[in-house]
Amino acid sequence: MAYSYTEKKRIRKDFSKLPDVMDVPYLLAIQLDSYREFLQAGATKDQFRDVGLHAAFKSVFPIISYSGNAALEYVGYRLGEPAFDVKECVLRGVTFAVPLRVKVRLIIFDKESSNKAIKDIKEQEVYMGEIPLMTENGTFVINGTERVIVSQLHRSPGVFFDHDRGKTHSSGKLLYSARIIPYRGSWLDFEFDPKDCVFVRIDRRRKLPASVLLRALGYTTEEVLDAFYTTNVFHVKGEGLSLELVPQRLRGEVAVLDIQDDKGKVIVEQGRRITARHINQLEKAGIKELDVPLDYVLGRTTAKAIVHPATGEILAECNTELSTEILAKIAKAGVVRIETLYTNDIDCGPFVSDTLKIDSTSNQLEALVEIYRMMRPGEPPTKDAAETLFNNLFFSPERYDLSAVGRMKFNRRIGRTEIEGSGVLCKEDIVAVLKTLVDIRNGKGIVDDIDHLGNRRVRCVGEMAENQFRVGLVRVERAVKERLSMAESEGLMPQDLINAKPVAAAVKEFFGSSQLSQFMDQNNPLSEITHKRRVSALGPGGLTRERAGFEVRDVHPTHYGRVCPIETPEGPNIGLINSLAAYARTNQYGFLESPYRVVKEGVVTDDIVFLSAIEEADHVIAQASATMNEQKVLIDELVAVRHLNEFTVKAPEDVTLMDVSPKQVVSVAASLIPFLEHDDANRALMGSNMQRQAVPTLRADKPLVGTGMERNVARDSGVCVVARRGGVIDSVDASRIVVRVADDEVETGEAGVDIYNLTKYTRSNQNTCINQRPLVSKGDRVQRSDIMADGPSTDMGELALGQNMRIAFMAWNGFNFEDSICLSERVVQEDRFTTIHIQELTCVARDTKLGPEEITADIPNVGEAALNKLDEAGIVYVGAEVGAGDILVGKVTPKGETQLTPEEKLLRAIFGEKASDVKDTSLRVPTGTKGTVIDVQVFTRDGVERDARALSIEKSQLDEIRKDLNEEFRIVEGATFERLRSALVGHKAEGGAGLKKGQDITDEVLDGLEHGQWFKLRMAEDALNEQLEKAQAYIVDRRRLLDDKFEDKKRKLQQGDDLAPGVLKIVKVYLAIRRRIQPGDKMAGRHGNKGVVSVIMPVEDMPHDANGTPVDVVLNPLGVPSRMNVGQILETHLGLAAKGLGEKINRMVEEQRKVAELRTFLDEIYNQIGGRNEDLDSFSDQEILDLAKNLRGGVPMATPVFDGAKESEIKAMLKLADLPESGQMQLTDGRTGNKFERPVTVGYMYMLKLNHLVDDKMHARSTGSYSLVTQQPLGGKAQFGGQRFGEMEVWALEAYGAAYTLQEMLTVKSDDVNGRTKMYKNIVDGDHRMEPGMPESFNVLIKEIRSLGIDIDLETE
């Protein structure tokens, strides 16, 4: 197998048993593919597919004027180039977007001609605002901050059948309902009431009988009954009737007479209930008619109106119950045929017939009026208005759209075969839904499960952006229609008609402030990836936290392989926000799909199919771990399978599909937890959530025990530098890597150079530090997609969120009581958990009423010492160490003249104090912060003179750019001359460049010439002369191109910045703050085992083993059994083995053993004990040595979820490392020197430092701001608030009888306004007395009681 550049340097021992049938797909595909589809950038007019922007335009255009004399048609669109690249946008605080230009065509028709002849056509490109672009990592830069648009899981459009679970009516009767949900437009609900009539609601308004809707659609009573019922036909014969017999319909009835066959044999006796056996006999006997008495039809309902044969008089209306009077009339009139509805109580209820009976309307117009009154109460209905309203509700493509998904779901649910059709409803659709609903009420068919993933679909970025864009376009459409009527008379062009503001505003609003457009979680690479793969049920058109019940939040069988059952937040959002499973993707309709291997007759093939939850329902799906032999035949007698959403067992030949991987069930974060299968789900949930909060440490350290997913996450997250093309490293330093591209990957006519600028010490959204470090050296060969530089929290191209710590599980002096963590001082000394945080502090100089603010080093009443870190422009130097209260940017603000006291006048007269008209508003370092200035940015408004600092920053940026371009040119030039050299050497010259005619060209000759003189050579062969000319032209061309590029960048840098109105200058100062681990910081493992550091002990006091090696962390063993996360113990044991093997390799390297010995030992580790075999024979001796050197800190292991290391393999590894197989050892107490009573579990666990640092939470207040009404101090660190002394704390002081302390708490320390000012003055004067007064909140209480109309006063005597 082929190893990548970084894999060769450090191979992870893989314990998985199952082969990789399929690689984990690109993890950000869901975001990138969706937005690419939306933009269709680079498509020509004929290549546009009917999705995204194109579809939005097509749905709104053509716009036709009210008069119909002019129309505006859409032709196509194109996207421009972004003004700034991503880094510049972040720096300047602008949106990374491209201009959208739409080509439209204005057509003016000739009013005079009858067939709309075209009079004039104008075509023009119109600017339609900016469309934000997605960066290559799936984020958007909006106003300079990186944001992510989270995908939404919402109810798919279509038709759904449900019941109320017996909750509506006290009898517990199930009331069935149907709901047609369009993609946009009015909802249509049908529902049964407790009396079994069917009602309809439109948009959840007042309900009407369902027959009103059917009448409004133009159906008559007879047509309705005809559609829903079959009829019984009776023929009148003398005194009795004869029924046209359909034997099945008699089932369950009691025979009124003996039923006999032709031969007179009694099949059913009178008074007997007719059973299935009787029906079989009747069918065999072939009886066609059955004589029944006249009263047999009493109470039955007529299916058609009964008409007097002679006069045509209606004897009984359609849908009337037959009574004795009506029967008498019928007999008298001589009617020969009566049709009644066939209903029964078992499977054919009279629901629609009953509904028609309670319906007050009798024709289409009345029904339309009734619907109009319900939709628009209080408005007088007219025929036209009622018809228009009804047609617009469900039958107008502008107002109603089922969408392709909705139509597909709708047709499938009501049993049609075709999946395409109109986006609006038709009569037949509504009748079909009603029929299905009645069938379900009759006991045929089942209701839908709305939490099934076949009924919920994912809306991704592209689709949501398209919807917003359409909303904007519809707003534009109204305005354009108004103006189109004037277009002809005033000779307007398309751009005069279209105002792009509403479109731009709609898009901006969506990206800037939609609930699903979120500030990206950028703590570490994992949190970025997880945020982009998140699927939320909240948001516009989705659920709300308060209304979502248990069912929606619960894990559903269809989540398997689509949505992770583990990773979801704790708290009010649990189950509403989910994460995509590792292999899941969406299909063209937005339903989540999971991959499966095809199984044919018990043989597993390598064909892979992606199926949605609907498609997989009928399949029998085996687990990925089902046992197979060499020929891939399933060999178990019974295989554990999933079928019809149930877990069961089947014979191998029944199996049709098989999972592709055991980790396809869980999300990326959960698949990073080793031994996940041994952890309780609740703790695994915490584990996967806490990995996202890990702060990148100063030196990343790969996990000794991983799962093999670390490499995928690091590569796909975009924090590492990945080679775009293969080649040789030409030069590398801390900030850039230059690759000379391999010849076979160079495209003709372009420079074979790739320059990768590394990100150095940049601030992330969470104030953590983003920094990239090169892994490659000059001269190394890299292949495409090799990792060349590590980013934050990555180590040699693998995700590394924490540090491997030597831990012991033991209770120790109560230092680790209740999940506390005891650390060794060595951890702090070695900077294991030291993190760098970067804070951005901003100083804004504005134009005020009294004059402009000024950024300057000349600040009134500030000593020299405070200014020693500022330059002459008043801005702090880069590299300055600053502490709380230090000035970073000096700024003065003009203040109004104040009345001076006589003393001040005297002082000013003596000292000539001039600085009284400005006040000091400098930017200072906030309290509790100490750090180093690492960068300063100055932004100046156009037209304002730039200060020296801004110019020097600009110059250094230009130098950087110039250096880049020169480097590129140097390599291009070098490569070109190398190619020329190989072409020229060995040929004869004709002269030129000081050479004689016929002189042979050798390397020496060429080395003696300057590069510029090579082009003066005249060669004997014309082909070579042509090559020289081409090379010269190419080099000149490249130089010109690079110069143009430089000028363009220079222009961008030198133009003024686009600042908010009234802002003259902005200075941003970046502080790097170093945080060591300290008591109060929160730490965690990967198994949900979290705790707070309680104490940091000296190294010599820590427990140590027989070799004197002290442990780094002491954890409480009581934290394991009750929480059931045993995975951490297995990780500890395997970590010990990994470290032990590393130490063994280290000894071999130090003793300079032969490579063959190393190779043998490595083979024992990788190929003798369980899991996958590694191809060590393909490594050269040097590569084996490099590998061994990198393994000295420990041999990294991978134990993939649900397919990891077994206990026997862990023991074998410990044995190979010469360690006790129990994983326990005898420890000695460092303080007393005594051995502990029993052996202790010691090993290596991967610990994370979470972004809940005590430094950010520490807070103290003396005086500060107060709440307006109650006059009590505000709460919280952000408001510089106080600590609330609550009701229970008051009880505590009351219990101790501490009356004065309590009085102080409730008055002068809180809301006694006069008391606290007096107290402050007293303390300043050194007098520590207090005079408590009336608390302000008591006055508020009195005012509230008075507002209730009670006169209340406080008697003070």
From Swiss-Prot:
Cellular component per GO, a single term: DNA-directed RNA polymerase complex
PANTHER family to which the protein is assigned, alphabetical: DNA-DIRECTED RNA POLYMERASE I SUBUNIT 2
Lineage: Bacteria, Pseudomonadati, Pseudomonadota, Gammaproteobacteria, Pseudomonadales
Keyword entries, A-Z: DNA-directed RNA polymerase, Nucleotidyltransferase, Transcription, Transferase
Gene: rpoB
Protein name: DNA-directed RNA polymerase subunit beta
Homology family: Belongs to the RNA polymerase beta chain family.
InterPro entries: DNA-dir_RNA_pol_bsu_ext_1_sf, DNA-dir_RNA_pol_bsu_external_1, DNA-dir_RNA_pol_su2, DNA-dir_RNAP_su2_dom, DNA-dir_RNAP_su2_hyb_sf, RNA_pol_bsu_bac, RNA_pol_bsu_CS, RNA_pol_bsu_protrusion
Annotated transmembrane regions: none
Organism: Pseudomonas fluorescens (strain Pf0-1)
